[in-house]
């Protein structure tokens, strides 16, 4: 009789273990947000992007009109312990997207493909900006901006990016790790960063930015809008 009782206990433990496994599988299936993470594939289809900050106010900086009528670009922003994530949603007819590829840091002047870019002033001191650009074909450009508007593409960083083409436009996804550049230590829970996004549309040869300028204007770094991010 005692032996039989122990067997029943053992069977019950197996049953409970199997039940817990089934419950865990159900949670993963029906609550992917609890277990997912952003994969840099250009698709922007992870649950995390649904709660991202959004920016959709742009100025036309080439030609330099500062017109604010552009509404075909949306920026998504997230951050975690790995770094800062940026998603670009670019609406335009598919047959106008320029996917020409180039070697790293080439294809700037003249540009040969549609581009998304971001310049980051991590210390928000208007001294140094780090620029990261990906074109629709997946080619990249990176470098620094100093002395307000002087560009130097000799600097190369270790960052991730990907693009994807859809029927109504294209998207890009960028991860800039916190280790990409030296940053001043801050004692607060949040870090204030200067930031400017831009989009180049080759078929129209127009550039739109979230700051009122570009490196080709007299003022650039000093006119960056700022955002606050968690201080990891």
Each predicted region: which residue ranges?
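Structural preference for beta-rich elements and adjacent junctions enriched in aromatics
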Residues: 36-232
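Bacterial N-terminal signal peptides
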Residues: 22-33
